[in-house]
Each structure stands twice: as structure tokens, then as C-alpha cells.
């Protein structure tokens, strides 16, 4: 029941808050919220039965056609920090579906939604709302990296514009210095880890914003843009409106934490962010693998027949 209540609230929050309107929308959105909460409950159970990666692949297939992968994937072993933009909805599912590793943990804010998914709890590094308690998050990440595990971090710490929906915008927000602090901590404690930038796009298909659902152009009504995108998210999770669309995942070069010797946390973070920003240029010069990934690097989210 918690999942249903939370899902319904998330759908309603993108619409007018008048009591009568909200009551009517609650009736309208009840079935989509019920379907979504059912899918998420099944995902939570599947994590225990099938593992996080396979559970994510199966859930992703409920919402998207596939993941189109561009570039060489991460190494199969050794501590790995995956740094990705965060357009929302399917980005985590795309990353999990594409990673060939079973040791993944995701850094995520403490939310009621995640608490309602008990199967996911062991795969999360929760970020407390109280900033004074966040030093433990850095220590938990460092512990996983030292042990050779994979950590997925969204360094902007917030939802960012989808780079395929907004090619006229710079989709990488300012990053947390946690990236640089982790590198310095590893150097001080005598271990190293890989750093893999990633860029995810296409989680919000452009066709969902045609006609009356069109979004304001860059520099226009920012609040209006965010509202229309939140409503599109509702159609994706509640009505599977992106079921025939693919998410694109571009991998950057694999960096190593010990190649940044002598730099400050801010300088390290800036260097890695610059590397990730280079992925934005993939679709702006020459052939466009964002739209036409090479045959060698394109694959479905799952090898299972549909």
C-alpha cells in the first residue's frame, strides 16, 4: 500500500493542487499508479531472486525498447566509480542493464519510495538529508571501492536535462567535490580505483512533447519545462508511453584514481567533469552515434527474447 500511495502522490504532484481537481485526478491516475507500484514491487522481489542487474533489465523492458550502448564498457573487475548525468526515470536502469558486474551499489537520497522497496536496500548507499551526517556516505563509497566493488554516483545530486531532448542546453550541472575527495582518500589510504564517466540520454523521448505537450525553448519558462517533463515521466511510468523508444548510454574512457596525483579535490572533480563533458560532443560533430550507435556497441538491455 505504501508503494501505491507514494506512486499516486508522485503522479499527482505534476498537476494543479486544487482539492476538487486533485480528487478527480486521483481517480484517473489510480490504475496507472497501481500498475507502476505493482511493477516496482515485482522488481524488488526479483532483486532477491535474480540479482540486481537482471531485475533491472526486466524492469527496463517494461518501460523502454532497449538500451543503445556507445563506447567501450567498464572493466569487469576492480573498484569502479561510475559517474553519470541524471536525466531521471530510466538512467539507473540503463546503467544497471549495461553493467556486466554483480557488485553494484547506487548512491541515492533517502526517500520514502526507496524505503518501500526492501529488495533494493542492500544495493543503496543512502544520502541523509542532514548534510552533517553525509561524511558516512563518503566512507561507505570508499569502502566499496577499496573492496573492488562498483559504485554509481550522480555527482550533480539532482535531476538534469536530457541531452537528447535538450541538445541546445548544457546538461551537466555543477558536480559535487565528492569525486575529488574520493580520489584523495584513496591516495591517502593506499588503494586505487577506476573512474568511468557515462552519459545517458533519451529517457524522455521527444515525441512525448509534441502538440499541446510541447516544452518551452531554452531560455524560456524553466518552471513550465520542468512541469511538462514531470508529466511526461508520469506517462512513462504509469502508461508505458516510451515502450517503443530506446535509451542511449555513452561510455567515456576509463580513468584511474592515481593519475590525478598532486591535484586538489576541486581540480580533480573539474578534470573528470571535463572528460564527461566530452561525451556531449559525440552527437555534435561528425557521425552521430547518439542516433546511430555502431553495430559493435549496440545491444539490447537483455539477451532474453521479448
Model-predicted segments: where are they?
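Short amphipathic alpha-helices and their capping/turn segments at secondary-structure boundaries
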Residues: 138-147
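Catalytic core of membrane glycerolipid acyltransferases/transacylases, capturing the structured
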Residues: 80-132
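A cross-family acyltransferase "interaction/gating" segment
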Residues: 162-261
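A structural motif
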Residues: 147-161
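Short His-Asn-centered micro-motif
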Residues: 71, 83-86, 107-110, 154-156, ...
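A short secondary-structure junction signal
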Residues: 93-94, 117-118, 136-138, 155, ...
Amino acid at each position: 500500500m505504501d508503494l501505491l500511495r507514494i506512486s499516486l502522490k508522485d503522479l499527482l504532484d505534476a498537476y494543479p493542487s486544487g482539492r476538487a481537481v486533485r480528487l478527480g485526478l486521483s481517480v484517473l491516475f489510480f490504475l496507472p499508479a497501481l500498475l507502476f507500484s505493482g511493477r516496482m514491487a515485482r522488481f524488488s522481489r526479483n532483486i532477491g531472486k535474480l540479482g540486481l542487474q537482471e531485475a533491472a533489465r526486466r524492469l527496463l523492458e517494461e518501460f523502454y525498447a532497449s538500451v543503445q550502448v556507445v563506447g567501450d564498457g567498464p572493466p569487469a573487475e576492480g573498484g569502479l566509480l561510475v559517474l553519470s548525468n541524471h536525466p531521471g526515470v530510466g538512467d539507473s536502469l540503463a546503467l544497471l542493464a549495461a553493467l556486466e558486474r554483480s557488485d553494484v551499489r547506487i548512491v541515492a537520497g533517502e526517500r520514502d519510495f526507496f524505503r518501500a522497496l526492501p529488495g533494493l536496500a542492500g544495493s543503496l548507499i543512502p544520502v541523509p538529508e542532514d548534510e552533517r551526517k553525509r561524511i558516512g556516505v563518503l566512507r561507505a563509497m570508499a569502502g566499496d571501492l577499496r573492496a573492488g566493488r562498483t559504485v554509481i554516483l550522480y555527482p550533480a545530486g539532482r535531476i538534469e536535462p536530457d541531452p537528447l531532448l535538450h541538445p541546445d542546453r548544457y546538461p551537466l550541472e555543477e558536480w559535487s567535490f565528492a569525486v575529488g575527495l574520493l580520489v584523495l582518500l584513496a591516495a591517502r589510504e593506499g588503494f586505487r580505483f577506476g573512474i568511468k564517466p557515462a552519459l545517458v540520454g533519451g529517457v524522455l523521448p521527444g515525441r512525448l512533447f509534441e502538440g499541446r505537450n510541447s516544452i518551452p525553448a531554452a531560455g524560456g519558462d524553466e518552471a513550465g519545462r520542468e512541469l511538462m517533463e514531470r508529466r511526461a515521466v508520469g506517462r512513462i511510468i504509469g502508461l508505458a508511453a516510451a515502450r517503443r523508444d530506446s535509451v542511449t548510454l555513452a561510455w567515456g574512457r576509463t580513468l584511474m584514481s592515481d593519475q590525478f596525483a598532486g591535484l586538489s579535490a576541486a581540480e580533480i572533480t573539474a578534470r573528470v567533469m571535463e572528460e564527461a563533458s566530452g561525451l556531449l560532443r559525440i552527437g555534435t560533430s561528425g557521425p552521430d552515434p547518439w542516433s546511430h550507435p555502431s553495430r559493435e556497441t549496440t545491444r539490447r538491455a537483455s539477451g532474453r527474447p521479448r
